[in-house]
């Protein structure tokens, strides 16, 4: 995993991926996978395909927020019930949510 990530390059890549035809959630996951050199399978990107435009067009949640939360879960999430790793995952996801909302004014 690459831990020396240029956030401007990551953002530029996400925009490039978005303009090539992926939606926000797909673009965010793909760009994070590239920047951090993670072994995220294409199926994870496919799993995010229902998030765009606020959960399938319902306008409820920004796909970029959902995609970012999925990547945090990939790195810090749990795979068994009761695993205390969930606490750090929640903490980081809330921090991401709050920063996104502060910068963009909403998560919807």
Residue ranges: model-predicted function:
Residues 1-108:
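Structured, active/binding-site neighborhoods that engage oxygen-rich ligands
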């Amino acid at each position: 995993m690459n831990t020396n990530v240029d956030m401007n390059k990551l953002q530029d890549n996400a925009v490039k991926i978005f303009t090539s035809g992926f939606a926000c959630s797909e673009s965010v996951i793909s760009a994070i996978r590239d920047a951090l050199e993670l072994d995220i399978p294409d199926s994870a990107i496919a799993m995010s395909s229902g998030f765009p435009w606020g959960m399938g067009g319902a306008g409820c949640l920004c796909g970029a927020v959902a995609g970012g939360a999925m990547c945090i879960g990939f790195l810090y999430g749990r795979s068994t019930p009761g695993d205390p790793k969930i606490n750090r995952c929640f903490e980081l996801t809330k921090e991401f949510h709050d920063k996104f909302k502060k910068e963009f004014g909403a998560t919807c």
